[in-house]
Design a protein with these regions (language model features):
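A residue-level marker of the well-folded mature domains of exported/periplasmic proteins
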Residues: 1-233
């Protein structure tokens, strides 16, 4: 409204690179001026971004600090600092000891892996009495998969105390599993989520803490950056 730009949002039914590529291909065909994407797999999107660039379309990403073939990537904050902070919060809540596991939406998601790398590094440096029980777990940004993977974790690691999520779907999925297994107070879900999604689980104690930024602000900034670049600034 401020600029007169016709900005709109589209999304796929499933969170996967192939769906994102198809959407970008469609936007290229429509000859839009700029495309802004939160990539599931930055490497997989490089060819289609190059195609967009070759067509004269500006390309931007959010949450993809290693993305190539784009005009700019826009980050909300320092991803390492964010990951370390989330570990600090979980560690304090667990009294600096116990077993935990980390989830990512996709193993190819840049920011999710940057957060988890920082979480694990912080734990190893600061909290030696905590233990990561398994490699990071992919839940495909799907709450049902997060729920099922959490049930598997709880069966495999009966001493598990914390589950750290990166995708917004992890906390509610993990918290539901914790609630159903009667483990509130013994196991907690932590990580990136929004109050509108996690409220009930924060209230009943299955989720212990969440961390977030304002997605609307990220969208606003991305649009304004695109607008300024289109004007030649």
């Amino acid at each position: 409204k401020e600029t007169g730009v016709n900005a709109y949002q589209i999304g796929a039914a499933t969170a996967d690179p192939a769906s994102q590529i198809a959407l970008i291909e469609d936007l290229i065909a429509k000859k839009v001026d700029a495309i802004i994407v939160v990539p599931n797999d930055p490497v997989a999107l490089e060819p289609v971004f190059k195609k967009a660039n070759d067509a004269g379309i500006l390309t931007f990403t959010h949450e993809a600090s290693n993305q190539k073939q784009v005009t700019f990537d826009i980050e909300a904050f320092d991803n390492e600092a964010y990951g370390r902070h989330m570990m600090d919060v979980m560690a304090k809540d667990l009294n600096y000891e116990g077993e935990y596991a980390c989830f990512v939406g996709h193993l190819t998601s840049t920011t999710h892996n940057e957060w988890v790398d920082a979480e694990i590094a912080q734990q190893k440096e600061k909290y030696p009495n905590m233990k990561l029980v398994t490699d990071r777990i992919e839940e495909q940004e799907n709450q049902q998969i997060a729920y099922e993977k959490t049930l598997e974790l709880l069966r495999t690691y009966p001493n598990l105390k914390g589950i750290m999520g990166s995708a917004m779907s992890t906390v509610p999925g993990a918290a539901l599993a914790i609630e159903e297994k009667g483990l509130i107070g013994k196991v907690g879900a932590y990580g990136t989520c929004l109050p509108s999604v996690a409220y009930d689980y924060l209230k009943n104690g299955a989720a212990k803490s969440i961390h977030f930024w304002i997605p609307a602000d990220a969208g606003y900034v991305s649009c304004m950056v695109a607008w300024e670049v289109l004007k030649g600034n």
